[in-house]
Regions:
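Cytosolic-biased juxtamembrane loops and peripheral soluble domains of multi-pass membrane proteins
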Residues: 91-120, 176-178
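Short loop-to-helix capping motifs
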Residues: 21, 35, 124-125, 180
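Selective transmembrane alpha-helices of multi-pass membrane proteins
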Residues: 67-98, 157-170, 175-208
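Short alpha-helical transmembrane interface motifs in multi-pass membrane proteins
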Residues: 7-12, 81-84, 115-119, 155-156
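Core segments of transmembrane alpha-helices
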Residues: 120-132, 192-195
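Juxtamembrane transmembrane-helix termini in multi-pass membrane transport proteins
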Residues: 3-73, 131-152, 156-157, 168-169
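Alpha-helical transmembrane segments of integral membrane proteins, especially early/N-terminal helices
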Residues: 37-46, 82, 111-123
């Protein structure tokens, strides 16, 4: 792969990953409510899902998925429903105090955080269309596809994980301030509203 090709790809990925979305908000809110470790687990769940989408798109399977109206709608409606559910949970949340959890509860929480991140990361079917359209612009058919995949995927993972970690740390750093009287409730209302809005917007998405 030529250096200029990688630079152009990196710029495209930088713009993509720097744009805040549901996964960023989820890591932020998890950092506020549960601390850095669970927020990082959430980030890894989201990263796993998006990396799978990237892989499917790179191998050409993304074209098959993106061309199926049925599959697109299934992903869309499941993702929208889950985002709206997260919003409702945020509205109902009363996280005004913390308590220590035993190891079993912590283990369960990490599993739940990973699954939550994975679902949100995979909730937008347009990601498949985006990557499917992106890769042909940069793939060199005369070079090793495996090497190119490793470079493309590695670059994406570094940037995506960096941004999600940033939002997780931001949540941790602002948690004390947010959990002062009245602010936690406002934060829950704001995040709940954003999740619900994202779910509603996703439900109206189409493949075009």
């Amino acid at each position: 792969m030529q250096l200029d090709t990688w630079i152009y790809y990196t710029l495209a990925i930088l713009v993509l990953t720097a744009s805040p979305g549901p996964s960023s908000l989820l890591c932020l809110s998890k950092g506020v409510s549960s601390g850095f470790r669970l927020a990082l687990t959430t980030a890894l769940g989201s990263l796993s899902a998006i990396t799978i989408i990237l892989t499917l798109s790179f191998t050409g399977l993304g074209v098959v998925i993106a061309s199926s109206e049925f599959v697109f709608n299934i992903i869309k409606w499941c993702g929208a429903a889950y985002l709206i559910w997260l919003g409702i949970q945020a509205f109902r949340s009363k996280q005004n105090d913390f308590s220590k959890s035993d190891s079993a509860q912590v283990s369960t929480s990490h599993v739940s955080a990973y699954i939550s991140g994975f679902i949100v990361g995979s909730s937008n079917p347009k990601a498949i269309i985006f990557f499917t359209a992106l890769f042909p612009q940069f793939i060199d058919p005369t070079a090793s596809l495996l090497t190119q995949y490793a470079i493309f995927a590695g670059t994406f993972v570094v940037f995506e994980l960096s941004w999600l970690t940033f939002y997780a740390l931001l949540g941790v750093k602002t948690s004390n301030w947010l959990f002062e009287a009245g602010r936690a409730k406002l934060f829950n209302r704001l995040t709940g509203g954003v999740f619900i809005s994202a779910g509603v917007m996703l439900s109206t998405a189409n493949r075009s």
